[in-house]
Swiss-Prot record:
TPR repeats lie at residues 9-42, 43-76, 141-174, 175-208, 238-271, 384-417, 418-449, 451-484, 537-570. SUPFAM superfamilies: TPR-like (SSF48452). PANTHER family: TETRATRICOPEPTIDE REPEAT PROTEIN 30 (PTHR20931:SF0). This is Tetratricopeptide repeat protein 30 homolog.
Length: 657
């Protein structure tokens, strides 16, 4: 043990306290562990070891230390209290309660009652929690805070807010209290007030704790990770960044939400708290299904985990068509189904899961959900109209109006998944008229919603003869970010609008979009030269696919090949998908002797396929599968393998003709 060898005789105690004072807890823990192994009954070493574990939030090891101390020194009631506190923080409420009930020291009575109340709070036993808190002295600020926490958990956010503010006046500024107030504002829908308090917490953290490297990862600096510690916990920085993430995510400012996760003090992944891990998972849900689902699965097996984890994992499975897995998780966790899912979520999940096997039953559930959502939407719409007619300028009434509007928007967010699930059933059957009929029926309530307008545009576009009407829906979506953030618009939206323009002879408008996207990609590459940008490629691929579908394969294939030059920069999962569709269609037509292409075009395609082999090795053509795959099958799931197969097939039909 080198650390021990470096300590001079007689300097053991001063060395340990110096390490603790300098927050070098890992070094102190290593020395204390060694000392404890040499002398298991060393009171000082074991007590300090428990303290270090507790400070670094390793509560299970802290509980083990205090368990030994309370066993070896039963008359030291303080150790029993520390043992119970460590078990409580390790989320073992039953064990913590067993320990705290053995404390008989009158001097620790109030602390014991506080801890027992906290345990009841953790178990959601709010009735007994309030009874215990009422036994405590009323002049204690922590009692006021505890009462506020109970009010918050009961949904009485205004009362909780008032008590947290009183506690702040009584105790002075504390980051934890400021966070609690911000959380109450968030629950009341007052996001501006919440964000102001969050900013204050973060600014104080930047000033008081430069060692936490706040915001440096976002700026691109390579910094050391931060360990979990009581100082980090008391700063409330992690909680503040996660709350800011929740606000931005809810208001659909996903870029700002992502920055919240990189702005917070950097930690190792194994040190992440459950809320941070959950937020990281939902942040990548649309881009990295495997990583997102793995994080949510891990959380589901942890204690505790955010209540939203269960629903988010199930909806993530359904979104990616893993209905069997979703059904298994639902069946294997009946307790979580009852605790974590409300009636709406449960019914929607059942409709999604059983749609492939029992569509009639699923459609009945969806129709029932549809009616329930529409009823609530109509009710809130009437309340909003009444409020508007009153035309009051009172602040409370203004907040009430804002809350009504937010309730309407929240209800709309509940209705849209029902509508889209219903529409998807007909979409998969290519019954686009039925889909359009569903959307028209919801026009009164959804016509301002971005998702609704986008899906209406797609539905009209797929009917082929309604390109002009489809363009009218796509144009507002594109125009919102045309001049500054065109690359933030999904490439398929731009591609479909370009096709609409081409099919309605509006070539100038189509060229304008292509030029704007090209310039935006060039500017983006100057800032991030190692990044890949696929918008221009996907648009060109869709245009190429359009010409192929109209029978002009030679021009279409040339457009496809040029869209992916150079492959090192342009090859990706999406771009390869559109390219290979055209190539497969051409091979099929040539094999049937329906199509004859010039030799130069065929050789151009063969050369393109050859150029895809090297950059395509690490581009997998199937989503991350949750089932273990054999090594051989995984080799066949990348661009390299598919490019070689297509080249062989193309050469076969080319020489055969």
């Amino acid at each position: 043990m080198n650390a021990m060898l470096n300590i001079k005789e007689g300097e053991f105690t001063s060395t340990i306290y110096t390490l603790i004072h300098e927050h070098k807890f890992n070094d102190a823990i290593r020395i204390l562990q060694y000392q404890h192994e040499r002398n298991p009954k060393n009171l000082a070493a074991l007590s300090l070891l428990g303290y270090c574990y507790y400070y670094t939030q390793d509560f299970q090891n802290a509980a083990d230390c205090y368990s030994q101390l309370s066993y070896n020194y039963p008359h030291h009631s303080q150790y029993k209290l520390y043992h119970a506190q460590a078990l409580y923080h390790a989320f073992k409420p039953a064990e913590a309660l067993n320990v705290v009930t053995t404390i008989q020291d009158d001097d620790l009575l109030n602390e014991s009652i506080k801890l027992e109340a906290a345990i009841k709070y953790q178990e959601d036993d709010l009735v007994n929690c309030r009874i215990l808190v009422d036994q405590l002295p009323t002049d204690d600020a922590t009692v006021l805070i505890n009462t506020a926490c109970i009010d918050y958990k009961e949904g009485n956010y205004s009362e909780a807010l008032q008590k947290f503010n009183q506690a702040t006046e009584f105790s002075g500024y504390q980051s934890g209290l400021a966070y609690s107030i911000a959380l109450c504002y968030y629950r009341r829908g007052d996001y501006n007030s919440s964000l102001q308090l969050i900013s204050e917490i973060i600014n104080r953290g930047i000033k008081d704790h430069p060692e936490f490297h706040i915001g440096m990862v976002t700026e691109g600096f390579d910094v050391n990770v931060v360990q979990n510690s009581m100082t980090l916990h008391e700063s409330a920085l992690i909680e503040a960044f996660n709350l800011r993430f929740a606000i931005y995510y809810k208001t659909k400012d996903f870029k700002a939400a992502k920055e919240c996760l990189t702005d917070m003090p950097p930690r190792h992944e194994h040190d992440y708290d459950p809320v941070t891990l959950h937020n990281l998972a939902i942040n990548t849900a649309n881009t990295d299904f495997g990583d997102s689902s793995a994080k949510l699965q891990f959380l589901l097996g942890s204690n505790p985990f955010p209540q939203e984890t269960f629903a988010n994992l199930l909806f993530l499975y359904c979104k990616n068509d893993y209905f069997g897995l979703a059904a298994d998780v639902l069946a294997e966790n009946p307790h979580q189904s009852f605790y974590c899912l409300n009636e709406y979520q449960f019914n929607l999940l059942e409709a999604l899961i059983y749609m492939p096997t029992s569509p009639e039953e699923s459609l009945k559930k969806l129709e029932k959900l549809d009616k329930e959502c529409m009823t609530r939407l109509r009710k809130i719409a009437v309340e909003i109209q009444i409020k508007k007619e009153q035309k009051t300028s009172d602040k409370d009434d203004s907040l009430e109006m804002r809350n009504l509007i937010e309730s309407y928007e929240d209800e709309l967010e509940l209705y849209l998944p029902v509508l889209m699930t219903h529409a998807k059933y007909y979409w998969d059957k290519r019954d686009y008229l039925a889909v359009e009929k569903l959307f028209r029926a919801s026009n009164e309530y959804c016509n301002e919603h971005h998702t609704w307008k986008l899906n209406v545009a797609h539905t009209i576009f797929m009917q082929e003869k309604k390109y002009k009407e489809a363009a009218l829906f796509y144009e507002p979506i594109v125009n919102r970010k045309y001049d500054g953030g065109i690359l933030e618009i999904p490439a398929m939206v731009l591609a479909n609008l370009v096709v609409c323009y081409i099919m309605t002879n509006q070539t100038d408008e189509a060229e304008s979009i292509l030029k704007t996207v090209e310039n935006a990609e060039e500017n983006a590459l100057m800032s991030n030269p190692n990044e890949k940008y696929f918008h221009n490629s996907i648009i060109s691929l869709v245009i190429g696919s359009l010409y192929c579908s109209k029978g002009n394969f030679e021009f279409g294939m040339s457009r496809v090949v040029k869209a992916l030059e150079p492959p090192e920069k342009k090859l990706g999962v999406d771009t390869w998908y559109y390219a290979k569709r055209c190539i497969v269609a051409a091979i099929e037509m040539m094999a049937k002797n329906i199509l004859v292409m010039r030799d130069s075009v065929v050789m151009e395609v063969i050369q393109f396929l050859s150029s895809c082999e090297i950059p395509g090795r690490n581009i997998y053509t199937v989503p991350d599968d949750l089932f273990e795959q054999a090594a051989e099958s995984k080799v066949k799931c990348n661009v390299t393998y598919e490019a070689r197969m297509l080249k062989a097939a193309l050469l076969t039909v080319f020489h055969g003709s």
